[in-house]
C-alpha cells in the first residue's frame, strides 16, 4: 500500500453476504460517474507511483488515484488492491481462488459502511446492467440460510431501504473522523464501514468501499 501523506486509499474485495431487507434501485451511468469524480477529488489524491505485482513481478505505472472507480454492471465500484500490504495486479487477483492474500495469507477485507452514529452492514449485489440490489440489516447482523436467502431475493417490494448518506455528508464524516484520530491510529486502523447513497432525482448511486485513512 502506498503510504503517501494526506492519502485516502480504498480497498475492495467482492465478498457478498446476505443481510436483512432488500430494495432495487435504478442507477444511470452519468450519475454514478459524476459522484465517483467528486468522491475521488475530495478523498483520494495520490502522486504517480510505480507498483510491482508480488506474484508476476510486472510493474504498473499509473497517475490515477488508488481509489479509482469504474462502472461495472451499472454500479460504481472501487477496483484497487484488497490486501493493504502486498500489491497484486488485477490479472493475478482474478486467478486467486481463495479469499486470502497469497503472500501474507490474511483474509481479504469485507465491505462495510457507517451511517448515522452506528456502524452497521450494507451489502449490494449487481442484478443486471441498470439495477442494484441493496441488502440491509438494521438490527443484529445475521447470515441467512439458503431458504431465507431465496425468500428474500424474491421480495422485490420491500421498503426496508432508506438512504443514510448524501455524498457531501459522507465526505464531511470521513474528514471529521480523520481529524479526530491520532497519526498512529490512522496508520493502523481502518474506517471500514463506509458507503455513499446519493439520490439525484429518481436515481440513487451506491458506492461501497473499504477505506484506509492513511496520512
UniProtKB/Swiss-Prot annotation:
Q: Which GO terms describe its molecular function?
A: zinc ion binding
Residues in RING-type zinc fingers run: 53-105
| Keyword Membrane applies | no
The answer to whether keyword Zinc applies is yes
Residues of the signal peptide: none
Q: Highest taxon of the source?
A: Viruses
Please identify the protein, giving its name as recorded: Putative zinc finger protein ORF121
Taxonomic lineage of the native organism: Viruses, Duplodnaviria, Heunggongvirae, Peploviricota, Herviviricetes
